[in-house]
From Swiss-Prot:
Keyword Protease: no
Role, per record: Binds the 23S rRNA.
Gene3D superfamilies in the cross-refs: Ribosomal protein L31
Swiss-Prot/TrEMBL GO biological process terms: translation
MF terms in GO: rRNA binding; structural constituent of ribosome
Record's protein name: Large ribosomal subunit protein bL31
Family: Belongs to the bacterial ribosomal protein bL31 family. Type A subfamily.
Assembly and interaction partners: Part of the 50S ribosomal subunit.
Source organism of this protein record: Beijerinckia indica subsp. indica (strain ATCC 9039 / DSM 1715 / NCIMB 8712)
InterPro entries the record matches: Ribosomal_bL28/bL31-like_sf (IPR034704), Ribosomal_bL31 (IPR002150), Ribosomal_bL31_A (IPR027491), Ribosomal_bL31_sf (IPR042105)
Length: 76
């Protein structure tokens, strides 16, 4: 393998949406950094079987709905 081409791999703390914390190794941030999750396996509809909840981050969802909310895509 070539030297000095791979990102640093170190321990970080991951905080899930319910406050549960665990440590894992990652290339994210620096040693000891904290990664706060917005969506995790306990809340994601693909894993829970629930309906999808859309979070409006920075008004993007509102802007999309204002531009394309009146389209029907074949629904009558």
């Amino acid at each position: 393998m070539k030297a000095d081409i791979h990102p640093q791999y170190h321990l970080i703390k991951v905080v899930m949406t319910d406050g549960t914390e665990f440590q894992t190794r990652s290339t994210y941030g620096e040693e000891g950094a904290t990664l706060n999750l917005d969506i995790d396996p306990k809340t994601h509809p693909a894993w829970t079987g629930g309906t999808q909840q859309l979070l409006d981050r920075g008004g993007r969802l509102s802007r999309f709905n204002s531009r394309f909310g009146n389209l029907s895509f074949g629904k009558k």
